[in-house]
């Protein structure tokens, strides 16, 4: 009887991908990124191990949402002090810290445990078109999040 194959940390083949977020829909882009971070696109996927790849997201400042979400979608954070709840809209946060929008969307789609925190560290988000990871030789990954558009 053969044993079931289990990948190990040493056999894990981690690749680096670059994703351009320009004119992409936020939620659809985040689901694809979360799948790559978890490694669900690989035949060696194991639920309790980090078998995923690294993802670099560029042009985070140009990600879009549909409808009135720009004015209506709220991002909340709390300082921990009484009355310390801060709320801001998608448009305001996109002007201030555009990286945080994609980070928050992807983080919510990862497991809420130690593995999820480890997977989240494999995500690198940059507001502009430049990134400092050229030494890793990342592959360009085209993700099409606009329904009906040609890739």
UniProtKB/Swiss-Prot annotation:
Pfam family, one: Ribosomal_L13
GO molecular function: mRNA binding; structural constituent of ribosome
Family membership noted in the UniProt record: Belongs to the universal ribosomal protein uL13 family.
Role according to the record: This protein is one of the early assembly proteins of the 50S ribosomal subunit, although it is not seen to bind rRNA by itself. It is important during the early stages of 50S assembly.
Alphabetized UniProt keyword annotations: Ribonucleoprotein, Ribosomal protein
Taxonomic classification: Bacteria, Bacillati, Cyanobacteriota, Cyanophyceae, Acaryochloridales
Subunit text: Part of the 50S ribosomal subunit.
NCBIfam families in alphabetical order: rplM_bact
Gene this chain is encoded by: rplM
InterPro entries in the record: Ribosomal_uL13, Ribosomal_uL13_bac-type, Ribosomal_uL13_CS, Ribosomal_uL13_sf
Source species of the chain: Acaryochloris marina (strain MBIC 11017)
Protein name listed in UniProt: Large ribosomal subunit protein uL13
GO cellular component: cytosolic large ribosomal subunit
GO terms of biological process kind: negative regulation of translation; translation
């Amino acid at each position: 009887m053969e044993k079931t194959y289990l990948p190990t940390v040493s056999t894990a083949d981690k690749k680096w991908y670059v994703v351009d977020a320009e004119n992409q829909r936020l939620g659809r882009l985040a689901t694809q990124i979360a799948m790559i971070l978890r490694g669900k696109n690989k035949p060696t996927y194991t639920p309790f191990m980090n078998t995923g790849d690294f993802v670099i997201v560029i042009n985070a400042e140009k990600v879009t949402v549909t409808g009135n979400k720009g004015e209506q979608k709220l991002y909340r954070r709390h300082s921990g002090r009484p009355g310390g709840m801060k709320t801001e809209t998608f448009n305001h946060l996109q002007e201030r810290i555009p990286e945080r929008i994609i980070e928050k969307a992807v983080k919510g789609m990862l497991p809420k445990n130690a593995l999820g925190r480890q997977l989240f560290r494999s995500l690198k988000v940059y507001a502009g078109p430049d990134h400092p990871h050229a030494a890793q030789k990342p592959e360009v990954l085209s993700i099409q999040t606009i329904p009906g558009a040609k890739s």
